[in-house]
């Protein structure tokens, strides 16, 4: 059972996501939000935590379910996304992982139209939610866990 609930029209959920880069740090894998936006926008791959599941277990499960790969994960950020205008509150644990080669990914979840491999040098031209994730993607040294509070998710 996913950790999500709704109270008086306000939605809350807890999510684990991951910045998956190639070894050269030139590319990153993103998830298309086409199903919930009116234009092309992206999230980091991942999904909701299940009840009694920790955030690292969740990201391992989600990536294995969606992409059929096993990676080593490092927690790099906690994002609090609070969007009053949309009555939306999400707590997101962001992890980092590297992959030898994106060609080795076998997409199991809804086909490749759900995912996009993006050149990091082009990241500023792409709509990514929350927008603080762009800074995390461009970072090459994940030495400390960061904490961001986002009131404007778009």
Please identify what each model-predicted range represents.
Residues 1, 76-81:
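Generic short beta-strand segments
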Residues 1-17:
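Acidic, metal-coordinating catalytic segment for phosphate/diphosphate chemistry
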Residues 10-12, 40, 87-91:
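Residue-level preference for beta-strand/loop junctions
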Residues 17-19, 27-29, 94-96:
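Residues embedded in well-ordered beta-strands
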Residues 26-65:
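Conserved Nudix-box catalytic region and its N-terminal flanking loop in Nudix hydrolases
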Residues 37-41, 110-154:
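Nudix hydrolase/Nudix homology domain
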Residues 49-72, 81-132:
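Unchanged
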